[in-house]
């Protein structure tokens, strides 16, 4: 399950941001997850809940925003937003499409609490 390595990298990135901002803890992690990212949201959530226990994210809530697939048809120039995993143009049924969005996983926002002086 590659979600474990993804969550490990995500938590490491969160820790770097917390350190740079002198945060004592992270309370919320917002990510955007593309439908074509190859990451299963429920497995990602489970992995996050497991890995967060020993670090600065131990009280953090993970919010996952699913990013639909956005494609551009090379034949009819139609741009389409799709909620399923297909690269077929819904306008002309062409397979000659280019993915514009929906393949990535991005850290969008962190909510942190500052260290007290």
Swiss-Prot record:
Binding locations of Zn(2+): 73, 76, 89, 92
Keyword NADP: no
Key words of the record: Metal-binding, Nickel, Zinc
Alphabetized Pfam families for the sequence: HypA (PF01155)
HAMAP family noted in UniProt: HypA_HybF
UniProt record similarity statement: Belongs to the HypA/HybF family.
List of residues binding Ni(2+): 2
Key word Metal-binding present: yes
MF-aspect GO terms: nickel cation binding; zinc ion binding
InterPro entries: HypA/HybF
Domain of life according to the entry: Bacteria
Protein name: Hydrogenase maturation factor HypA
Gene giving rise to this polypeptide: hypA
Alphabetical GO biological process terms: protein maturation; protein modification process
Function: Involved in the maturation of [NiFe] hydrogenases. Required for nickel insertion into the metal center of the hydrogenase.
């Amino acid at each position: 399950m590659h979600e474990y390595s993804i969550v490990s990298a995500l938590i490491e990135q969160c820790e770097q941001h917390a350190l740079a901002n002198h945060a004592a803890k992270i309370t919320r992690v917002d990510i955007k997850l593309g439908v074509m990212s190859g990451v299963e949201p429920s497995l990602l959530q489970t992995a996050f809940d497991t890995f967060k226990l020993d670090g600065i994210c131990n009280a953090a809530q993970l919010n996952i925003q699913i990013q639909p697939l956005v494609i551009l048809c090379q034949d009819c120039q139609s741009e389409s937003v799709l909620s399923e995993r297909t690269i077929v143009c819904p306008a002309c049924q062409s397979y000659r499409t280019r993915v514009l969005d929906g393949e990535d996983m991005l850290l969008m926002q962190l909510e942190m609490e500052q260290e007290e002086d």
